[in-house]
Amino acid sequence: MTRARWGLTLLGFLAVASAGVARAGELVVWHAYRAEEKAAFEKVAKAYEASKPGTKVTLLAVPYDAFADKITAAVPRGKGPDVFIFAQDRLGGWIETGNTIEPIDFYLDEPTRARFIPTTLEAMTYRGTVYGLPLNYKVITLIYNKKLVTAPPKTDEELVALARKLTDKGAGRFGLAYSYADYYYHAALQNAFGGRVFDAGAPVLNNPENVKAALFLQKWIKDGILPAEPSSALITSLFNEGKAGVVFSGPWFLGEIAKGVDYGLALLPSIAEAGGKPMRPWMTVEGAYVAAPSKQKDLAYDFVKFVTDVKSAMVMAVEGRQTPSNRKVYDDPKVAKDPMLAAFKAQVDVAIPMPNVPEMTMVWSPATTAMNTMIRGTSPQAALDKAQAQVAKDVAGLRKRP
């Protein structure tokens, strides 16, 4: 081989090697963050790059409404990112589809497990295997107008007494307002009674505890303390106009509260008829996942681990206004003294992860129909029996698919 040809061969080898090294140091990450969350996450990604010289993290913000479909269509075909961030409600479906999310038990050590609020890691677990690390969570809690409510109610008896005092239908004022026809919101009451959607993987919407919870809701409706049309727009309007003393909602509601409205947050009340147990909302947990087709799995997991550590979680909490799953964050005075962050942490301690099984997608429509008929006086047993029959049929059809 001539010296010239040897030089060309060597240059070619070095070019290939160099390209390989460059690719090995590049990560593509998809997320749906906006505004302050987006800015905080970008800061965390830059910090990761600084900690790993030669590493490049490319972030792509995907509109939330299109995000799930984009993951479903692109990731299994190897056309997606190395890491993506999404809530756990689609986790089971993507795992069953295959080639979408990489299991991470192989990487996960005990110190990393221990950094999280246990139920948030539970939300990342499917059939005993962990598939993501939890970034943050969302739950509904009690939000009250301090001009109308001096001390938030701790029990349902206190809540009803307060709501009766504040309610004046003629003036369009209500003591309590929340989206009680929405099954997601109703779950907090249902869970207080020990209700559930599945037993050992089988749908059980018409179980006795679910019926009791629905009967209890009907009592609140008959008391006249709730608006008849509980749309989110109406609830926001009532609260901002000083016509709702208490609402049940999540962190998304806080951004809709008008300037000048003095509000506070507190735990959802306990329910005497449920044995004094607290209302237990469903929590949705946003996880960071390694895409199964990624050729940079080790680096991708390293990034996922970094963005969920305590330093990153502090940035996401203080600057991004997220409620992190990393429990060490709440030991920091900046977070512990923050009314919003402290209140949601207290609420998540009694919350239940929303089911992440693929069958859950078949629950929403029949459950919503049942809720809409029950709030108009239909027997909860009859309404839930009908919903159960539909969900059982749909689930059976799903499981017959090849």
Describe the residue ranges of each PLM region:
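Conserved N-terminal structural module of periplasmic/extracytoplasmic solute-binding proteins
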Residues: 8, 22-98, 110-113, 233, ...
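Short amphipathic alpha-helical coupling segments at ligand-binding clamshell hinges
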Residues: 40-44, 155, 209-216, 286, ...
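A structural signal for short loop-to-beta-strand junctions that line the ligand-binding cleft
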Residues: 81-82, 111-144, 175, 276-280, ...
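Paired acidic/hydrophobic, glycine-rich loop segments that form the ligand-binding mouth/hinge
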Residues: 82-85, 245-250, 264
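Hinge/lid segment of periplasmic solute-binding proteins
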Residues: 88-139, 151, 156-162, 188, ...
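Extracytoplasmic/periplasmic solute-binding protein
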Residues: 131-135, 140, 158-203, 209, ...
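Glycine-centered hinge/linker elements that transmit conformational signals in sensory
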Residues: 162-163, 201-229
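C-terminal lobe and pocket-closing loops
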Residues: 251-264, 269-369, 398-400
